[in-house]
């Protein structure tokens, strides 16, 4: 088996592109390499990078997040998803030692220590020669318990630049150079598309990934990478997670170019709780599939205003269903879609209109980072399947705000950290809809899939329907 963590000296060093390229090169069976099973992971709460890594590796990418999970849960997640893979590739976030606190307790280095992983350091070498040596030596000396097993030099200015860097690193350090990736206008163009193009546009995504994989395979010593990351320590898979034996409930899930932000383990947790997920397309389908509940996750609805607005039949059907009492949950982009309208770059587009407020896009993030929420007595899932719901840890990342809500709007959460809708509240409640800017994650501290599925079941019973009317 082979396991390694890809990190960098600072953010925006190109580690995502390198990670995607390595996942593709090692799993594709091309570039002089046999096809291997590569299990990708991503540190932190990000949605976009894992989507690309999933396509590149051909296996779902799973997030590992210190803020949302205790150490024991991270170890279990890593073992559960990585035990049957030949290669476990973990992409870090930000710099190797960057974190939320002074001790770096949630840094990439902390994850490498926890999971006993060698680190491959991606270095943006633009404008550097001899200074690369103290940069590497400083990273080694800062924490001797971290094994920097190799470096990949990125954005080089030509073969002469590469030769100088290799000579300096060989002379002053004991760290091998695993690869040297030249500055490449075409690769830079692909990198810019990564955050803009919906990865679930499969054909286009695979074309970009193939281009990245070919370039990385040609400039990184894949055999040396596998050599320094080899381990004989097997991962013991944890016990199988319990599954519901109740009759399944059908939950319609929006998944298309506009909406695609779902954690792989959240979808699995919905299934384990007894949900049958039925996917639909907000851009092309004219009505919801038959369902007992509705889920609309995050995405980029602002990039598809014309198509979403033009699909009047589906918008009307979604509104009828929610106003008729269909249990529904929406996050971020889903909340935007369910509002009256979205305003962006001088353009205004009508949306579903079940939330009596409007969305305005901004140039800078309105809410960005980790969130702590406290559910209140209005929360429709509070107590679903348990005696109560403690404070929830989650995250948000939105460039929009929801405004012109009625003064008597009911909310599900008090915001203890973060922004939410107005800095104080999140989780708009309408009928049996809960719509928030916050992205929840299924963890030991937030079992939202089981609670939502139980809520859907409760809504299907006559007693529940009689005691909890569909109030606006």
Residue ranges with predicted function:
Residues 3, 36-37, 248-250, 276, ...:
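Residues that mark the start of a beta-strand
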Residues 277, 301-381:
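Cysteine-nucleophile active-site neighborhood
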Residues 247-312, 316-323:
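Phosphate-binding active sites in nucleotide-utilizing proteins
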């Amino acid at each position: 088996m082979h396991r390694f963590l890809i990190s960098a000296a600072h953010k925006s060093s190109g580690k995502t592109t390198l990670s995607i390229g390595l996942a593709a090169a090692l799993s594709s069976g091309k570039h002089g390499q046999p096809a291997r099973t590569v299990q990708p992971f991503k540190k932190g709460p990000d949605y976009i990078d894992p989507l690309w890594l999933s396509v590149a590796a051909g296996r779902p990418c799973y997030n590992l997040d210190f803020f949302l999970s205790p150490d024991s849960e991270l170890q279990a997640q890593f073992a559960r998803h990585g035990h049957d893979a030949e290669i476990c590739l973990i992409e870090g976030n930000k710099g190797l030692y960057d974190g939320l606190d002074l001790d770096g307790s949630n840094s990439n280095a902390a994850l490498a220590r926890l999971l006993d992983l060698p680190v491959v350091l991606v270095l943006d070498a633009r404008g550097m020669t001899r200074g690369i040596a103290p940069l590497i030596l400083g990273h080694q000396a800062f924490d001797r318990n971290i094994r920097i097993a190799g470096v990949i030099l990125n954005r080089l200015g030509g073969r002469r630049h590469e030769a100088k860097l290799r000579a300096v690193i060989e002379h002053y350090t004991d760290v091998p150079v695993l690869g040297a990736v030249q500055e490449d206008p075409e690769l830079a163009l692909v990198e810019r598309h990564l955050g803009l193009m919906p990865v679930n546009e499969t054909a286009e995504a695979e074309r970009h990934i193939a281009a990245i994989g070919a370039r990385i395979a040609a400039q990184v010593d894949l055999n040396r990478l596998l050599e320094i990351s080899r381990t004989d320590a097997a991962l013991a898979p944890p016990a199988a997670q319990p599954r519901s034996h109740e009759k399944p409930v059908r939950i319609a899930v929006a998944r298309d170019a506009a909406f695609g932000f779902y954690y792989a383990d959240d979808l699995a947790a919905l299934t384990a709780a007894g949900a049958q997920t039925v996917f639909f397309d907000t851009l092309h389908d004219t009505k919801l599939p038959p369902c007992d509940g509705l889920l609309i996750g995050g995405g980029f609805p602002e990039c598809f205003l014309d198509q979403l607005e033009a699909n009047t039949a589906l918008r009307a059907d979604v509104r009828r269903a929610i106003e008729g009492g269909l249990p529904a949950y929406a996050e971020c982009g889903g909340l935007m879609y369910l509002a009256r309208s979205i305003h962006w770059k001088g353009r205004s587009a009508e949306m579903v209109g079940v939330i009596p407020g409007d969305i305005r896009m901004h140039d800078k993030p309105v809410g960005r980072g980790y969130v702590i929420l406290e559910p209140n007595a209005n929360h429709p899932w509070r107590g679903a399947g348990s005696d109560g719901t403690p404070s929830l840890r989650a995250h948000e990342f939105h460039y929009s705000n929801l405004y012109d809500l009625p003064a008597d709007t009911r909310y599900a959460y008090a915001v203890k950290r973060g922004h939410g809708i107005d800095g104080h509240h999140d989780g708009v409640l309408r009928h049996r809809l809960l719509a928030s800017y916050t992205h929840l994650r299924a963890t030991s501290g937030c079992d939202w899939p089981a609670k939502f599925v139980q809520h859907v079941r409760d809504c299907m019973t006559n007693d529940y329907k009689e005691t909890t009317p569909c109030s606006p």
